[in-house]
């Protein structure tokens, strides 16, 4: 039987699609419900649940992002188990959150032998570091190779140079 949360969410998606607009991002309470389903996924819904935690929760400092980052950090650190997300996948997803609540867990994971490289990959494309740049620098100064790689990546602006090249021309319509 489909959970009430998934039924409501799918009705919302259908309603918004009929209007030609995307579904709204998940709220913090909805993200909490999604996490409960991730812990014990209904058969046949596994891919949909992973897609939702990956793409339907806003990044940054939104309340839902805080719930998502907290759960992914717990999975990455091993204090929570998720049959659909390995610690490496949880760390990878933290790396896609652009900044905010994901930064501290990613910096902590730089010290993890198994996940440090994954955390570094996420931090290399994250610019919204705020005051935590110094935490990465301190780790690099103490010999953490993953932190050093992050600093080198930022220094070489790989977050920018790794992006696809813009086309030679872009056709636009300007309305006055």
Give, region by region, the residue ranges found by the protein language model.
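Amphipathic alpha-helical packing elements
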Residues: 2-35, 40
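Eukaryotic acidic, Ser/Thr-rich intrinsically disordered low-complexity regions
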Residues: 6-9, 138-176
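Charged, low-complexity interaction regions
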Residues: 21-25, 42-44, 61, 79-83
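Amphipathic alpha-helical scaffolding segments comprising HEAT/armadillo-like alpha-solenoid repeats
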Residues: 28-35, 59-78, 97-111, 128-140, ...
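Alpha-helix N-cap/helix-start positions at coil->helix boundaries
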Residues: 43, 80-85, 100, 112-117, ...
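Short, charged early-sequence alpha-helical segments and their helix-coil boundaries
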Residues: 43-56, 62-70
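Conserved hydrophobic register position within alpha-solenoid helical repeats
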Residues: 45-49, 86-90, 119-123, 147-155
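Structural signature of alpha-helical solenoid repeat scaffolds
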Residues: 50-57, 95, 111, 124, ...
């Amino acid at each position: 039987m489909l959970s009430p949360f998934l039924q409501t969410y799918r009705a919302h998606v259908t309603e918004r699609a009929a209007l030609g607009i995307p579904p709204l991002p998940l709220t913090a309470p909805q993200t909490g419900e999604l996490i409960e389903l991730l812990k014990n996924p209904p058969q046949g819904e596994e891919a949909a649940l992973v897609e939702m935690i990956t793409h339907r929760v806003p990044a940054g400092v939104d309340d839902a992002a805080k719930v998502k980052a907290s759960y992914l950090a717990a999975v990455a650190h091993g204090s929570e188990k998720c049959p659909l997300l390995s610690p490496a996948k949880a760390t990878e997803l933290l790396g896609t959150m652009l900044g905010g609540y994901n930064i501290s867990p990613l910096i902590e994971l730089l010290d993890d032998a198994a996940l440090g490289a994954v955390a570094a990959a996420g931090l290399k494309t994250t610019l919204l570091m705020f005051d935590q740049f110094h935490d990465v620098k301190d780790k690099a100064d103490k010999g953490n190779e993953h932190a050093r790689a992050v600093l080198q990546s930022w220094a070489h602006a790989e977050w920018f140079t790794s992006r696809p090249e813009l086309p030679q021309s872009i056709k636009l319509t300007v309305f006055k």
